Amino acid sequence: MQAPWAGNRGWAGTREEVRDMSEHVTRSQSSERGNDQESSQPVGPVIVQQPTEEKRQEEEPPTDNQGIAPSGEIKNEGAPAVQGTDVEAFQQELALLKIEDAPGDGPDVREGTLPTFDPTKVLEAGEGQL
């Protein structure tokens, strides 16, 4: 006798049939482990409850607003700014790095249009030759 779910992908079955199948799977898996006890894992869907907004606010530590002025501007207390010719040199070096690291053709590739390849002409030319 063929199982009711075999060959029918849309079969949902009754709750009892689904529960029975789940118990069968749980028992067969536990017996494969050499464990005759029922699995302590729940059979069926598990619903994870998300914390409510009030609980999230209680759990989150207060954020530290260092570096942000009351006006909303961010204070720059990090590394000193690069000025003058150093900026230009840095930009040139960065541009060179981007060019060198860019994927694609190397310096030995010539620009131009490649000839088109027609496989039917190749076959015609090679038909009489062995």
Swiss-Prot record:
It comes from the Eukaryota. Residues 1-88, 101-130 are annotated as: Disordered. Residues 27-42 have a biased composition (Polar residues). Residues 14-26 have a biased composition (Basic and acidic residues). The modification Phosphothreonine is found at T113, T116. Keywords: Phosphoprotein. Pfam families: GAGE. Belongs to the GAGE family. This is P antigen family member 5. The gene is PAGE5.
